[in-house]
């Protein structure tokens, strides 16, 4: 079994829980995910099955979320799963004030990930250290937010904002909610999150765990996405039989006029077949193709 699965992760399960369930369902040892989704979030969780796990780093990095942000509340995890540090009446907050501040979060920005995150510090994940009562100084990182679209606003003692976020990989929506509240002086936390797009996969085309169980039980076709479709954003280089032999031996190939950068390698023999991923660099006499992932 070989390919990608667009899984709809349900609420309250960890990404690892989903991977474990799919391993058992498909009877496959090699299943991995393309980006952690918090237990209190649902939506697209790209999975790779079989040797396709080696291709996970090459999925598109862009992501889209629908976030529910609650103002007037601060927690130690920056979402409702954590301990409440502050809860107050901020009924004075207006949508106009939010609209004025949102553009400052667009583009490449500096962001400090939440204390409760999967980032490793000295070999330990931050959430493990936080649960053990050993908070760390979390280093900031540069992330990219491409678009912020207001979908809804509810006034009240603790107003709520529905916000669509289009961003690059590594962006924490919990941190965005926290920082938005800090910038407005009200405090804020993430009260709900749905990942609508990730790894080039969309929520509309995802399959839930219950549906997948039924598919397996009824011995229907598993909706695996072929690598050449999942990695269609990459330029494709086709190899003939002679070049294929050299490819499978891990040899670098000097070829003319290839697109520089990461490319998808396929066979020109028979049906389209993914052979792996390579890096193309310019040389004096053409371009050189260096294997990065070779799939047998």
UniProtKB/Swiss-Prot annotation:
GO biological process, one term: mRNA pseudouridine synthesis
EC number(s) reported in the record: 5.4.99.25
Any Pfam family hit: TruB_N
Enzyme class (EC, first level): isomerase
Gene3D superfamilies, alphabetized: Pseudouridine synthase
List of catalytic residues: 38 (nucleophile)
Keywords: Isomerase, tRNA processing
Family: Belongs to the pseudouridine synthase TruB family. Type 1 subfamily.
Functional description taken from the UniProt entry: Responsible for synthesis of pseudouridine from uracil-55 in the psi GC loop of transfer RNAs.
Protein name according to UniProt: tRNA pseudouridine synthase B
Gene designation per UniProt: truB
